[in-house]
Amino acid sequence: MKVLMLNGSPHEHGCTYVALSEAAKALNEQGIETEIVWIGKEPLEGCSGCAACGKLWKCVVDDKVNEFALKAAEADGFIFGSPVHYASAAGAIVSFMDRLFYSSSRKMTYKPAACVVSCRRGGATATFDVLNKYFTINQMPVVSSNYWNEIHGNTAEQALQDLEGLQTMRVLGKNMAWLLKCIEAGKAAGVEPEKEKKIWTNFIR
């Protein structure tokens, strides 16, 4: 089994990376493979609403989003990490996840997911809420820890001093591994989620 992670920070080995790495270690100890994909520093386009993905089954902008989507099809779970920018998720990861979930959500449906957030001081829970909304609209079990998944520090070195934050990430990794194994056991026993066809309505009808 494999958990695919996204480092949504412009700093490849900063605080967000520390958080993801700590969760990855716990997953690895449970026999779960992990991969961390870095979002990079290059400008990332947001969703233009062109709806071409409905025909192409991928985003019309062929960049890291589509590369991640290909990996997502083979992954069993996900952890998305973001720094806090102005008390919310970083702009790049919002653009990334908007396009990823609009074009390739089927590749992630029913697969467990979590987000981790890094901040110097405040805005962590607001960012946490933003990222979790992608999972909860896509029928993805959300994995929790013993606290909200946040780590504090202005540098990677400072984040490594946040002992409670590091424990939160380890517990998250252990819980993710446990849920993945439960799902695998359920499938082996013939247990699958019961599906319903989506009903689309507007508020006025």
Task: Show which residues each predicted segment covers.
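A short beta-strand-loop structural module common to alpha/beta enzyme folds
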Residues: 32-42
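Glycine-rich phosphate/pyrophosphate-binding loop and the adjoining helix
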Residues: 141-205
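Cysteine-cluster motifs in flexible loop/terminal segments that predominantly coordinate metals
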Residues: 42-72, 200-205
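N-terminal beta1-alpha1 ligand-phosphate binding loop
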Residues: 2-30
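Helix-loop-strand module that forms the ligand-binding subsite of alpha/beta enzymes
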Residues: 57-147
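Short, hinge-like loop/turn segments at secondary-structure boundaries
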Residues: 51-55, 132, 161-162
